[in-house]
Amino acid sequence: MGYNAKVSLYLWDMRSDYSFIPDLCLSLPGAIEEYKETWDAVLYRVQGRIFALVLEDHDGNPLLNLKSDLREATPLHARYDALMPAYHMSKKHWTSLRLDLDCPEEIVRHLITRSYELVVAGLPRRERDLLTRLSTNPDQ
């Protein structure tokens, strides 16, 4: 896959504080990774729906966009410089993490997991049930 070199540097370089992100995203039941060339972005999806998106903003800053609840995200935006209303997506439903700025790992892990949970909650029941079976029996 031809990932953008700058985005790759922040996510996949073992010196990066954020090198855990791809593994965490892919550890979630039913999650897949894909590179969307037309967006020059790495997408993490569950049942076809995006829960995480790695891209650059117009200034070339690497970002991780995550689905979020505005009530939960707003205090985090105020507390951490690395977190802000999402770039190029609904500011009401998405948060951006600047990958070139620091944010505590436990906060990032929580935001990724919460993003996944919000997306899964919006899936039809049949698809949610399938993901529940996958999480309890990953060999299915």
Where are these regions (language model features)?
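Charge-dense, helix-prone N-terminal extensions
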Residues: 2-140
